[in-house]
Amino acid sequence: MNRFPDNARVVFIGDSITAANLTLPYIIHTYKTQKIASGIRFFNCGVAGGTAEFARISYDTDIARHKPTHAVVSFGINDSHRDLLANPRSKERQDALYAAYENYKANMTALVDRLHADGISVTLCTPAPYDEYTESKTPALHGGFALMQGYAEFVRTLAKEKGTELCDIHAKVSYLLETDPLISDDHIHPTNHGYFTLARIILAEQGIDIGEEMPIPDYFSRWHSYVAPLRCVLASECMIVRDFNAPTEQKMKMMSTRVENQDWIQPVFERFIRTYVEYKPQEAELYRMIDLTYEEDIF
């Protein structure tokens, strides 16, 4: 995996693991403090609940706007429809899992093709493993680890077919899990230590030593205060609105009605819906402030 050059514009495209914005700051900080490249810009294009399909749908709005030269792409856990594993084995379950996998392959291939057509250098990351075997308070889905192994293997194949660079997150994290608790009780999302480790893995692939583990530096706080609500708006589009190209007025009316009726669909969505109603009208300003605070505070 080559280092990003001077003046590169690097988008990190992925799901909630990317959107959490707990790995990218370490990569930016390392590039900055070790003076690896000048004039470089990094952009968080992660979406909680995101899939390769949603990345294609939101591409022009959320990815192409940054005029990227490089893209680091990681999807799989949401594309897999892993919750089907909670159902008893049946032909219907098998068919649904297979359909999800075929859909993932088609959308990942199309996403890479679009990035290449736009002249963007692509690094594909295999999805992080589903941590099926570490004991936790939350019961694991039987077969989750094997499911994500299949998705990781496809990404390895796709990288070879398309001539992209590859960062094999799945293999490296799977190995480390034997002795290092990197993933939280939900078996999917990293711990804070896990997010740092992801940055270490990516940078190590570029021949860069991140150094000792540390908290995210304070100078990222203002930038993150704009990244977080914007990523939440996109997550709401993906998981709740589910009609990205509908008129904004229609989407705002639907989400405002949910707030008025306290209709959250499920409790975890309350924060997303409230954030959407507050910040969707400010979406363009959030993008502007992300760029401004990056320039003023970070790089």
Over which residues does each language-model region extend?
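Serine-esterase "nucleophile elbow" of acetyl-processing enzymes
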Residues: 1-48, 53, 58-71, 198, ...
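Conserved catalytic region of serine esterases and O-acyltransferases that act on ester linkages
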Residues: 6, 161, 182-299
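Solvent-exposed loop/turn segments at secondary-structure junctions
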Residues: 16-19, 48-52, 77-82, 128-132, ...
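The substrate-binding groove and active-site-proximal loops of carbohydrate-active enzymes
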Residues: 48, 92-103, 139-146, 189
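Active-site segments of SGNH/GDSL-like serine hydrolases
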Residues: 74, 78, 87, 111-146
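Charged, glycine-enriched surface loops/patches
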Residues: 90-125, 154, 158, 162-164
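Substrate-gating cap/lid alpha-helix
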Residues: 132-169
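Flexible glycine/proline-enriched surface loops and loop-helix/loop-strand junctions
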Residues: 138-141, 179-187
